[in-house]
Amino acid sequence: MQYRRFGRTNLKIPVLSLGGMRFQKSWDQLDFSEVSYEEQNKVENILDLATQYGLSHVETAKYYGTSEVQLGMCFKNTKKIPNIIQTKIPPNSDPEIFERDVLSSIEKLKVKKIDLLAIHGINTAEHLHPVSYTHLRAHETCHN
């Protein structure tokens, strides 16, 4: 697998990543108990195969339905956790809501930290300004 430096950081990121948009039973935010064995097994098999191929970066998002919770169960039940876990949350000008979204993703993914956090859906200049302020708190939340 080829790697590149991620922006101005020292993080080496693979040129291919595993997208988790279709890792969901539903686009709705459902509890894991509503996910069937077959649906979860599909995600586990894909994650296992991706790991065998050297894909060490997986991404998901709050708005990908049950994707975060299903990936979280995979991470809980296996030792094959990708080196880089990324999720996306919506922009929010309220730092408490922003932080709550970050912590919710960490909880659903059953990890101690998120390696990469993306802001999903910055569609206007108004969305960007609050993000520049609140991302500092998210950084502290993700890395402490």
Where are the predicted features?
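Acidic-and-aromatic substrate-binding clefts and catalytic sites of carbohydrate-active enzymes
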Residues: 61-69, 91-98, 125-127
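Active-site beta-loop-alpha junctions enriched in small/polar residues
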Residues: 21, 63, 88-92, 119-122
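Single conserved hydrophobic/aromatic residue that forms the stacking wall/gate
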Residues: 135-144
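N-terminal binding-site loop/beta-alpha segment at the start of enzyme catalytic domains
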Residues: 1-82
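Charged helix-capping and loop-helix junction motifs
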Residues: 100-101, 130-136
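Aromatic/hydrophobic pocket-lining residues that form the small-molecule binding cavity
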Residues: 43, 98, 102
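Active-site groove signature of glycoside hydrolases
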Residues: 109-125
